């Protein structure tokens, strides 16, 4: 049997080390959720602000984090905690808009947190993680063993989800219009268009920030589908916001 090439052996050991390090970091991340005094909430709020006005600055900070902590993903759960608080507050507004009782509000809150945010995020992060590592990763001696961390893919989702949350759970509250008029559909559906396109754009920035990925522009391709769906929704008279309100009110709660 021929001996295994040295570079292949090195790559394999690097990947094993990377997986062990990732598991250890995820354990520490979950453990820190119970230690709120160790969380940097001020920095989490700074990130949320710049995700809305200059998201590239947020990902430049991820570069610095990689250099100092040897991982791309966050090791501080403060961002997730603050995002959960935002979800709770915005859900109160939706409870008033939908005229929910306390139990209905509680069921709605659980759905928004564990399905809309975390559940959908787990699916999207896993798909992006697999796709990027399988098709976009550059295999060179310099980048040997470097992969997209699953935790980083989930962080990218959380980053993209926050502006979407502001648009659909806060701004949209002022434009919940049930009238069967074109202007009603135009305002509501336009908010959905902006939210989804911005979600895709911030996701693109997150993966394009990784130096070992190529052709990350493909992540922007779903924007075309979103625009087509937006035009079709206006043409056929579908009020997206109204449909989701009815879904939450009659199916979730």
PLM segments and residue spans:
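Membrane-helix and juxtamembrane interface regions of eukaryotic multi-pass membrane proteins
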Residues: 1-145, 178
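Generic structural signal of hydrophobic/aromatic residues within well-ordered alpha-helices
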Residues: 29-30, 93, 127, 170, ...
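Charge-rich, low-complexity amphipathic helices
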Residues: 77, 81-84, 218-219, 225-229, ...
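Transmembrane helix-loop boundary segments of multi-pass membrane transporters
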Residues: 108-109, 183-189, 248-253
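Hydrophobic alpha-helical transmembrane segments and adjacent short intramembrane/lumenal linkers
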Residues: 129-240
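Juxtamembrane boundary at the C-terminal end of a transmembrane helix
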Residues: 235-253
